[in-house]
Amino acid sequence: MKIMFVHQNMPGQYRELVQWLADQRAHQIYFLTQRKNPPRFDGVETRFYKTHHRPAENAYGLSKNWEESTGNGLGAARAAKQIERSEGFKPDIVVGHVGWGELTFFKQIWPDVPIIGFFEYYYSETGGPGGFDPEEPVTENTPFLLHARNAVPLANIETVDVGLSPTYWQRDRFPQSFHRKLYVCHDGIRTDQLRPD
């Protein structure tokens, strides 16, 4: 199988999965990332993308995340299409994290390729980051800014064929309408390293 992973900070949540698939020696695997000097995996071709656009420092707060995410999405999609043109690699499946917008435009380049998206978090005023981090105090704009950050997963729920969330708590933060596509699949804990004494 031809598999393309997409994550700005390779390998992200996919370290064990990528390693396991590569060890099978039965797949052609590409990993598309922005990370400089990412870890190397035998049997995995690492390729890089550059964001198409970064918002200005003083960009409008409600749209800043969307602007950055669509810049990532266009940069990743263009890089993926260039890989197909120059290297002849068109994946049978794309796997990636939706949080930074990287998967947003993959159906525009490969409408027939299934996409599995990792849905990590949906923002709301309560039970999440609002008021949690002292570095980001709650203001009268906090509810609007948190909701605006949801534009990326809202766009991507229609882009992906299947979505994964690592826990039921995370999945349940998303609107009920997402649940038809979201499956809970834990992304792993290294029990050989993280366990009670």
What is the predicted function of each stretch?
Residues H53-S63, V113-A151, D192-D197:
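Acceptor-binding helix/loop patch of EC 2.4 sugar-transfer enzymes
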Residues P11-R15, G101-T104, R171-D172:
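Short, well-ordered alpha-helical microsegments
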